[in-house]
């Protein structure tokens, strides 16, 4: 009986690590297209004043536009995903608070409650950040 409880605890902790990793990585993926956008922004600025570099300037300007719009619309998509995931965490939080099995799940029930609330708050905060940056970009 004791080993079964220990196994359940290990299974739970492995699952929570995967979910926790997803909640930390997902909001930051939107930054990936931003780095090349910054590079091509400065490159097009330098080439703008360079005589005879019209073709290179247009190429850099088009690449900047591509990565900029990818970052902006990617931010909008991630904002929607974050709201969905945060809502799922909120439902899990409510289930843990008001569920019958919360009192019996003493070894990891309260830790799960704190982790779920923290993930919900983090995702909600990142949603507001991405919604603000998307609104400023449009």
Predicted regions and their residues:
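Juxtamembrane boundary at the C-terminal end of a transmembrane helix
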Residues: 125-138
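Canonical alpha-helical transmembrane segments of integral membrane proteins
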Residues: 22-41, 80-89, 117-126
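Membrane-associated alpha-helix detector
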Residues: 2-73
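Intrinsic low-complexity/disordered segments
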Residues: 7, 70, 79, 104-105
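Short alpha-helical packing/oligomerization segments
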Residues: 58-97
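Cytoplasmic juxtamembrane regions at transmembrane-helix boundaries
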Residues: 89-118
């Amino acid at each position: 009986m004791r080993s079964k409880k220990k196994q359940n605890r290990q299974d739970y902790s492995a699952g929570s690590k995967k979910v926790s990793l997803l909640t930390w990585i997902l909001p930051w993926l939107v930054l990936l297209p931003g780095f090349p956008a910054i590079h091509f922004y400065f490159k097009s600025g330098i080439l703008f004043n360079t005589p005879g570099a019209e073709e290179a300037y247009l190429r850099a300007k088009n690449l900047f536009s591509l990565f900029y719009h990818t970052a902006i619309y990617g931010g909008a998509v991630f904002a929607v995903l974050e709201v969905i995931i945060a809502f799922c965490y909120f439902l899990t939080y409510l289930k843990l608070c008001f569920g019958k099995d919360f009192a019996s799940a003493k070894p990891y029930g309260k830790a799960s409650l704190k982790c779920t609330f923290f993930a919900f708050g983090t995702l909600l905060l990142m949603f507001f950040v991405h919604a603000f940056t998307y609104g400023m970009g449009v």
